[in-house]
């Protein structure tokens, strides 16, 4: 299973599948379709049935039930795209067998080193086979590790019919990293009662709580006048943007928050005298606090309009997804089964909130309760991303065990 996992994963990461928030198409990039087509052929070759890919790049397939019991149909999902935070073009995965601790040189020429001094968790992986980048790209374990783990698990179930299970559906989705993964996902066609995204981080992660999330765009109009004659005439849009931002609590940003704490995050600020634009993401686990955060944006905009004019500021806030806990708690047994599956495979479950979102956040509100399970990777979205092959195998074992437990408990 280990060699099969390495071959699959390294094949997937070499395909550039970064999504693009500036594109309106679905998927947003051609590279995602390239990998989707590759997955379709591979799924057929290993015996997955009813394999489909629609015009939007959503790939689905079926492992038929092999039991007489009436077992709920379950699904496993991963996303095809990789993050936009760092380049994902020409990924060159590096294999480090039997890691012995200490620094890992990713790129000698560029002096890029993955060090436990900077990333203390690295020391936990002594004896593991690690896959890293070459220091010039991200790796793409988020979420190609999930794809590899699902594919390997499905292949294992097909090759081992003695493991009884109900009907299983798998899906690989585009554009998760830009928040659109479930937008065109056909829940009815997928036909599962419950599902799991394989999109978490380190070994044991089991998550059924996510942020409530919104995006905000603040567009500001100023008035540019020659600075030599600007007194009482010039209005600097850039300065108004600074005023707007400084009215937000300075300690409620990502670098100062953890656990269940929410935040405001300024992701982009471009400005000059004539016009400026600020883009934010707004996050909180608590629905009331989430609404309070959005209300604060409205108040700041209103206060500044009172000073600079009604047309000086245009604020747009759009909800992106909600805390999936509300939809999963009524069917908490699906979390309990994942918890038991991990313990059965000698994995210690680590239940914690997702300080982010997954496709499951939105799918849960579309009628498909979908908690999230670990992939085994760390340091996603950057050049220091790495993953343990042994922990990828554990994720595959947990997927197989979840399928077995649903049949056993039916």
UniProtKB/Swiss-Prot annotation:
Keyword Nucleotide-binding on entry: no
Binding locations of Zn(2+) 1: 79, 142, 199
Predominant location category: cytoplasm
Documented EC number(s): 3.4.11.4
Cofactor mode of binding and number, as noted: Binds 2 Zn(2+) ions per subunit.
Catalytic reaction annotation: Release of the N-terminal residue from a tripeptide
Keywords: Aminopeptidase, Cytoplasm, Hydrolase, Metal-binding, Metalloprotease, Protease, Zinc
Disulfide-linked positions: none
Protein location: Cytoplasm
Ranges in coiled-coil conformation: none
A Gene Ontology BP annotation from the UniProt entry: peptide catabolic process
Keyword Secreted in annotation: no
GO CC annotations on file: cytosol
CDD domains assigned to the protein according to its UniProt record, in alphabetical order: M20_peptT (cd03892)
Active site, renumbered: 81, 176
Single Gene Ontology MF annotation: zinc ion binding
Cofactor entry: Zn(2+)
PANTHER family (UniProt xref): PEPTIDASE T
Function: Cleaves the N-terminal amino acid of tripeptides.
Family note: Belongs to the peptidase M20B family.
Name used for this protein in its record: Peptidase T
Organism: Bacillus pumilus (strain SAFR-032)
Gene: pepT
